Amino acid sequence: MRYYEEDANVTDSPNRNAAPKLIPTIKLGSQDNHDMMWNEDFHLTITNMAKKYGAIYALETGKTTLIALNDHNAVREALVNQSDVFNIRADLEILQVAPQKHFLELEAGELWSLHRKTFATAMRDYFRDRWDTMDQWLVTEIDDIEAAWKSQGDQAVFDPNRDISIKLASFLHRVMFDRRFGEFEESVFDEKSLSWLPAGFINSTRYELMPEHNKESYYAHYGDVIEKFASNLNGLDAYVSMNVLKEKECYNKGQYRHLTDFLLNACDDIPNDVKQQVGATEKEIIIGSLTQVAGAGGGVGAFALRWMLLYLASFPEKQKQVHAELDQVIGQNETPQQSHKGDLHYTQAFIAEVLRHCSITSMPASNYAASKDTFIDGYFVAKGTPLIVNNYGMTRDEALWENPDEFIPERFLEADGTFSKKQQAKSFPFGIGQRRCLGELFGKFLINTLFTHLAHRFEFSLPNNEPINLRAISGVFLVPEKVDIKAKSRSLSDS
């Protein structure tokens, strides 16, 4: 172990009167450094290193030195208390190339502020008074999922990925372009494409940070994942760009058919001199925004549902409690409504605990960097230093969670059995600070609606004698390594 030392003469530091502590550093060339840069389970490796080096440590790479934040206090200090300091994009090539450089999370400064405000306004105006319509559209897709699963019989073992992914993509296509997927879209849709993005981002970043003499061997091992990341991200960008071009042909300012129209109108309303000043174009405001709706909404929504069905199947006693509540509040042969959510306390606790326990967002897709010299918990951080924010570490923070490795939905319940908002406030599946996910409300709507309907309609189980497997494919989002389940209809008419 050695320590990261910098010139600590920082006049505006919150701890300027105290001598800076030296950051424990994982030195380039050490075995620990090799593990950090090569291990497939990056989220586990970075968390395990915190047990040895502490909640805050530095990682030397072939390109720069990064600071890893691994518990709630460290992350909150940087992203909440010093959000004005850690508000720039790290100087990494992967963050500065198209199409991802046009994504809101990967922008900084005035461009980020303008893009966020414009995107937020467009989403707010689009969803206002449309939640009931959104619910109906999503239930239409869920009905198709139900029909597909019933048709294969209750003894069929299957991965629900394609059915969930394609129907969620169809719903989002309707939100963005006012039409569901047709036969052509379904025929060319690759449900695995979004699954490559989280791991691809991590491995592409590590490849860039590798010393030159290690890059060839690293690419030989991870090159397939890196190439799929680039090709699938470009494919997603092309899909959105093609559809936006179609919609622009019949676009009339002031008329609103879908989310794309709201973004087109919002982009038109930005004065040209402001766009030029901050470097904002349609590529950011429209294409970048919609690509994130399709990618994050479709990807994370599908990842979350696969996790939740896997947890239902893996913990049958917990599933019985979910079913008992759904039957009591809704009725076994009735249809869930958005108005039921406030009475589904155990169901909400189950959802919250799955998102915590699987740690679906293991780290932000953006790499923050310090815009000036500063301190975190007494450790000096030089201007331009990139951060690794370990969200997975926060889900295993024993200062926040008792027995964090155990799956306990009841931890999100108060003593009277109601859902605990206090506990929910300690969990950050959509990020923390001013850069937390802009689509959090929409994401929660998707996850809650899909889960409530599917849990209400089916009983899920593992194949006979199949052990519980909650292993994840590591990336900025954690994707289930394997989901093989059975689905038995709970409808009384099917009994």
UniProtKB/Swiss-Prot annotation:
Keywords for the protein's UniProt record, in alphabetical order: Heme, Iron, Metal-binding, Oxidoreductase
Binding site for heme: C437
GO MF annotations in UniProt: heme binding; iron ion binding; steroid 17-alpha-monooxygenase activity
Entries under SUPFAM superfamilies matching the protein: Cytochrome P450
Keyword Cell wall biogenesis/degradation set for record: no
Database matches in InterPro entries: Cyt_P450 (IPR001128), Cyt_P450_CS (IPR017972), Cyt_P450_E_grp-I (IPR002401), Cyt_P450_sf (IPR036396)
Tree of life domain: Bacteria
Enzyme Commission number: 1.14.19.-
Cofactor(s) this protein requires: heme
Family: Belongs to the cytochrome P450 family.
Protein name: Polybrominated aromatic compounds synthase
Lineage: Bacteria, Pseudomonadati, Pseudomonadota, Gammaproteobacteria, Oceanospirillales
Gene name of the encoded protein: bmp7
